[in-house]
C-alpha cells in the first residue's frame, strides 16, 4: 500500500502546494511503531479474525486464547469468542487454531488529523476498517 500511496500522491500530486509538510505513516501492525495517529494521515494494517464456529472444537488449551496479546479471545461454553471491542486486529490468533477455525480478512485502519512537535495532537481513527484497498486509497485522496 505504501508504494501505491507514493506513486499516486507524491508523484501524482507533486505540483500541488500544501500549507505545510504533509506527513504520512504506514504501519503493518497495530503496535504503533510508526505513530500513525501522530501524522497528518496514518494507516495501520489490520488482520480481522473471523471465526467459523462449526470448526471450533472448544479445546481446553485453546491456541488462540494463549496467543492473544489483548485478552480478547476467551472460551465461553466450550466455544471460542473474540471480543471485537478489545481485539486490536493484530492477527496473531490467525493460524493458532489447530483446526483452522479462524481466518483473517485484511484491511486498513485510517487515522486523520494527527500532529507532532511542540503541540502534539492524536489523529482520529475513521469509524470503518477498510477491507478494499482501492476504497482506502479513494478515502485517502
Cite the ranges covered by each PLM segment.
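Small-residue-enriched alpha-helical segments and adjacent helix-cap loops
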Residues: 1-61, 67, 85-86
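A domain-level signal for the structural core that forms small-molecule/cofactor-binding pockets
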Residues: 31, 41-47, 106, 111-116, ...
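Hydrophobic alpha-helical scaffolding
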Residues: 58, 80-83, 129, 133
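A hydrophobic, small-residue-rich beta->alpha segment in the mid-to-C-terminal subdomain
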Residues: 114-140
Amino acid at each position: 500500500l505504501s508504494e501505491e500511496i507514493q506513486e499516486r500522491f507524491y508523484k501524482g500530486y507533486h505540483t500541488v502546494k500544501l500549507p505545510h509538510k504533509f506527513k504520512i505513516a504506514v504501519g503493518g501492525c497495530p503496535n504503533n511503531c510508526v505513530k500513525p495517529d501522530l501524522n497528518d494521515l496514518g494507516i495501520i494494517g489490520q488482520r480481522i479474525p473471523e471465526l467459523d464456529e462449526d470448526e471450533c472444537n472448544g479445546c481446553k488449551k485453546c491456541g488462540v486464547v494463549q496467543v492473544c496479546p489483548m485478552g480478547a479471545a476467551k472460551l465461553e461454553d466450550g466455544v471460542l469468542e473474540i471480543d471485537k471491542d478489545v481485539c486490536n486486529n493484530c492477527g496473531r490468533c490467525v493460524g493458532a487454531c489447530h483446526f483452522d477455525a479462524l481466518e483473517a480478512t485484511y484491511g486498513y485502519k485510517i487515522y486523520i488529523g494527527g500532529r507532532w512537535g511542540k503541540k502534539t495532537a492524536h489523529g482520529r481513527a475513521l469509524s470503518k476498517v477498510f477491507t478494499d484497498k482501492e476504497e482506502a486509497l479513494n478515502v485517502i485522496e
